[in-house]
């Protein structure tokens, strides 16, 4: 997007990193949103919830995501080649409902980097009594329900046409609808395709100033936010890019901090993890050792620290991909994928991991190849073979990895054509996007033929069949 005025500014981007959400208002007229609302009413009454077919069933909703403010916010957070994924859902909150419990849509994932987000659109004015989505700011950094304070809940109220961009891991719920009216919220899932190399928002200053952040944040909160900010700026981790209070290696201090990982609350342990990361390469051996723990929480804390350390951790993580225990191999693969571009030396080891006996290792290895190997075709033949894996999560991650490689994946067009009939709907959907990004004449022909035969007619219904 060329017009910088529609991109987020530095303060909005910092708020997104800290709180996990940002809200924008479309330029579309009130009449447009009223028409979306009425079409939604008609579809729900006559056919029920269209689920993933929401967009082809009500195609005018695409205008919301073509809006310059919405496009600008999505570009700012995910980069200009962001991807509207096949999963979307219209959430209906009926009159006099009790609402939902707080939850995360994405499950308990490890990474703090923004590779996935949700866009929430209201086609009607949504005051608090109508049961808006409630969110817990800053909760996307935590995977345990006990870490979340319900008293911090904020209702996402707004006029018709309000769109809130949230981190996929943000804890949220439908709040009680105490009114006599219906509330609809259209939820769409988006993914980052390219690892950040430069800021994609209207960036004026690449420095992170703690004075811009809430006084309630701890020193280690700021370290965490700063790390994510630097990642979004495309500054390679592992090069001492943020100030450190550590003046010299201290093996005793490192050992003391590592030993208490997992012995306190999740927020405190994540604070400790980012504090350990400031020791850089000196902390790597002790942190990699923690990947051997049978506690998923401890492995995640080590993952956070190793991801922040970056390139100096790559060699030890490559070695860990050969560990006898599957969870160590899986954790190493996931950490390498999260480090991203700086972990390119791991590509051969991750290709080897595609033959691992553990489904979890294969899932994470193919995903990692999509974030690490984005600038060459080395992994493409092996990723194409993984499209035939018996595990559907491996196939899903493989096809998305090929989509991320884009034109470098041109050798996989025939393999992608085969999975357009996969049993998993998301493998099919992501294969369409992979072909679009490959964009060779062969890929375009395969794509056009598939879309012609799978065309959806939004005017056809049981009342009007032809």
Residue ranges and their predicted role:
Residues 98-157:
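Catalytic core of non-heme Fe(II) oxygenases with the double-stranded beta-helix
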Residues 1-109:
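Non-heme Fe(II)-dependent double-stranded beta-helix
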Residues 23, 164-165, 187:
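Hydrophobic beta-strand signal
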Residues 264-265, 294-295, 324-325, 357-358, ...:
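Short inter-helical turns and helix N-cap capping residues of alpha-solenoid HEAT/ARM repeat scaffolds
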Residues 175-259, 269-270, 280:
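Non-heme Fe(II)/2-oxoglutarate
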Residues 226-249, 267-282, 289, 297-312, ...:
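Structural detector for internal amphipathic alpha-helices that build alpha-solenoid repeat scaffolds
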Residues 157-171:
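Conserved metal-binding segment of the jelly-roll/cupin
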Residues 256-258, 286-288, 316-318, 349-351, ...:
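Buried hydrophobic core positions in alpha-solenoid tandem helical repeats
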């Amino acid at each position: 997007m060329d017009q910088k005025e529609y991109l987020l500014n530095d303060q909005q981007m910092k708020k997104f990193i800290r709180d996990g959400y940002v809200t924008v208002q479309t330029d579309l007229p009130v009449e447009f949103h009223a028409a979306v609302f009425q079409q939604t009413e008609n579809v729900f009454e006559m056919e029920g919830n269209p689920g993933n077919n929401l967009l082809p069933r009500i195609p005018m909703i695409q205008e919301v995501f073509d809006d310059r403010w919405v496009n600008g916010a999505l570009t700012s957070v995910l980069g200009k080649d962001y991807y509207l994924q096949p999963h979307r859902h219209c959430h209906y909150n009926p009159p006099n409902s009790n609402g939902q419990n707080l939850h995360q849509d994405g499950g308990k994932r490890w990474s703090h980097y923004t590779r996935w987000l949700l866009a929430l659109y209201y086609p009607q004015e949504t005051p608090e009594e109508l049961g808006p989505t409630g969110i817990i700011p800053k909760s996307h950094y935590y995977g345990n329900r006990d870490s979340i304070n319900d008293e911090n809940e904020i209702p996402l109220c707004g006029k018709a046409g309000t769109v809130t961009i949230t981190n996929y891991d943000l804890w949220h719920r439908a709040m009680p609808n105490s009114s006599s009216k219906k509330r609809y919220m259209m939820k769409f899932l988006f993914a980052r395709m390219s690892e950040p190399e430069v800021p994609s928002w209207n960036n004026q200053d690449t420095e992170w100033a703690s004075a811009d952040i809430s006084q309630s944040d701890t020193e280690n909160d700021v370290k965490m936010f700063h790390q994510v900010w630097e990642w979004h700026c495309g500054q390679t981790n592992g090069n001492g890019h943020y100030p450190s209070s550590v003046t010299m290696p201290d093996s005793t201090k490192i050992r003391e901090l590592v030993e208490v990982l997992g012995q306190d609350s999740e927020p405190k342990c994540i604070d400790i993890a980012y504090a350990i990361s400031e020791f850089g390469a000196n902390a790597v051996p002790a942190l990699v050792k923690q990947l051997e723990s049978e506690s998923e929480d401890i492995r995640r804390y080590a993952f956070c620290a190793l991801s922040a350390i970056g390139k100096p951790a790559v060699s030890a993580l490559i070695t860990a991909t050969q560990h006898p225990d599957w969870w160590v191999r899986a954790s190493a693969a996931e950490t390498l994928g999260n480090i991203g571009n700086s972990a390119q030396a791991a590509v051969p080891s991750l290709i080897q991991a595609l033959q691992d006996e553990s489904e979890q290792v294969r899932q994470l290895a193919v995903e990692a190849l999509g974030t690490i190997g984005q600038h060459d075709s080395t992994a493409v033949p092996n990723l194409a073979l993984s499209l035939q894996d018996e595990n559907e999560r491996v196939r899903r991650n493989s096809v998305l990895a090929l989509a991320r490689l884009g034109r470098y994946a041109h050798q996989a067009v025939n393999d992608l054509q085969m999975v357009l009939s996969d049993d998993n709907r998301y493998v099919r959907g992501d294969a369409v996007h992979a072909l679009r990004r490959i964009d060779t004449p062969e890929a375009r022909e395969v794509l056009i033929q598939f879309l012609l035969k799978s065309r959806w007619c939004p005017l056809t219904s049981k009342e009007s069949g032809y």
